[in-house]
Amino acid sequence: MLRLSERNMKILFVAALVVGSVFFLLLPGPSAADEKKKGPKVTVKVYFDLRIGDEDIGRVVIGLFGKTVPKTVDNFVALATGEKGFGYKDSKFHRVIKDFMIQGGDFTRGDGTGGKSIYGERFPDENFKLKHYGPGWVSMANAGKDTNGSQFFITTVKTAWLDGKHVVFGKVLEGMDVVRKVESTKTDGRDKPLKDVTIADCGKIEVEKPFAIAKE
């Protein structure tokens, strides 16, 4: 009887292993829908050290999506480093609208009518794969279709009405509180800050391993 009992226990043990393996194999893996929910990958970062008037208010670090919009990202990085002999350093955020966005990047005229890209004065819309999902997304400002230069804006709320019209290429990873300080600065009737909001310094931060962020 003892031998039969041991044999039965072994059979039951093996059966349990088989059933467990089958159950594990039948568990659903990540669906195509789940994969689509994954956000874009950050391949490089750019930092802005901002100043309002004579006060340094902190650093904003922006993650850029070089695999999704490589041409747009290359332009932004080069303007942040100044490697082409011109760029964002000492330029201003010339337009600030609370509960909407802050806009900068016009380093030639400083009033929203200038700026240029590393490809020439303007370059085409790369794609509209990404949307303005919420606060902190960075997108190209333009004057209509295919008129990208150097001007950009950072959202402070979800701005779905801009989807398909402006190329999204980055998101604020650090320093959203600094963006909020700029958003809250006093402006005139044309949305220009009463005190200059300046990019006192800027540059590139390498990313060793690209990582995805949430679309939120």
From Swiss-Prot:
UniProt signal peptide: 1-33
Gene Ontology CC annotation, any one: melanosome
Activity: how regulated: Inhibited by cyclosporin A (CsA).
S-nitrosocysteine: modified positions: C202
GO biological process terms on file: bone development; chaperone-mediated protein folding; neutrophil chemotaxis; positive regulation by host of viral genome replication; positive regulation of multicellular organism growth; protein folding; protein stabilization
Annotated motif Prevents secretion from ER, positions: 213-216
Location within or outside the cell: Endoplasmic reticulum lumen; Melanosome
Chief subcellular location: endoplasmic reticulum
Enzymatic class: isomerase
N6-acetyllysine modified-residue sites: K165, K209
Modified residues (N6-succinyllysine): K84, K209
Known partners and oligomeric status: Interacts with DYM. Interacts with CALR, CLGN and CANX. Part of a large chaperone multiprotein complex comprising DNAJB11, HSP90B1, HSPA5, HYOU, PDIA2, PDIA4, PDIA6, PPIB, SDF2L1, UGGT1 and very small amounts of ERP29, but not, or at very low levels, CALR nor CANX.
UniProt function note: PPIase that catalyzes the cis-trans isomerization of proline imidic peptide bonds in oligopeptides and may therefore assist protein folding.
Name recorded for this polypeptide: Peptidyl-prolyl cis-trans isomerase B
